[in-house]
């Protein structure tokens, strides 16, 4: 049981969509007349082994959770067959899996099966319990997985999911800046996705010399993760700041201003995701793939999983194919 529980970094699974609120404060601009939230922490995501032979860069871990409520974890993953993320459970949070290259095939114990490819998104609400597998579809498979906490009154809801094709993700381009709006709003366009925990998830690409200012609701926590950057490229918050390398998390401080970013590379594009969310403000107790509010709830979750009850009824019998 513990071996399955400790496969804590699964790649997404189940998710639901509703229409997003019209949040005007989430617009963006490519002009220069803005003050940005400050950068309060930078973390370089080092390589580590995860799952069954997979490799991840863990950008957010428990040391960043207090600064980034409601976010629990961010992994940049790379996996090739026969490695992967075999059968494992979840309870109490959501996951967002964004495939950058290749494909990931998902199966769960409720009979769902599907594959998402480069540019596709899978948004999972694990709720009261899910067991699933996530395995590579092609020779090279890369992407991001974000874990988003659920409030106490939603941790035991029924799990559900849906997939969003890359062609369904709204896109905009202006002055050398392209954005893919996975959740939230930017450049006057907004995603059809509404998450249970209000969340912004934007994929920006800045050409050499381009810049962007993205507004973020004042009460939300925000961070960026840099996917690609050339020498001297990614500069955040102040145009005089030092560039930050690829595979780094940039944590922004509080404020009623948004986030400003410059690509100062002369030859290479800057690609990063900007992620922000409304804090839940509740205690977080995590045991691997289970995230609850108290230790007693974690103990009950382990018991439920072990004995196959309260959402884990299929735990003893189901195996992915």
Curated annotation (Swiss-Prot):
Its main location: cytoplasm. Interacts with RD21A, RD21B and XCP2. Disruption phenotype: No visible phenotype under normal growth conditions, but mutant plants show increased resistance to infection by the bacterial wilt pathogen Ralstonia solanacearum. GO terms for biological process: defense response to bacterium. Involved in susceptibility to the bacterial plant pathogen Ralstonia solanacearum. Stabilizes the xylem cysteine protease XCP2 by blocking its autolysis. Belongs to the pirin family. GO terms for molecular function: metal ion binding; peptidase inhibitor activity. Keywords: Cytoplasm, Iron, Metal-binding, Nucleus, Plant defense. It holds the Pfam family Pirin_C. Fe cation binds at residues 88, 90, 132, 134. It comes from Arabidopsis thaliana. This is Pirin-like protein 2. GO terms for cellular component: cytosol; nucleus. The keyword ATP-binding does not apply. It is found in: Cytoplasm, Cytosol; Nucleus.
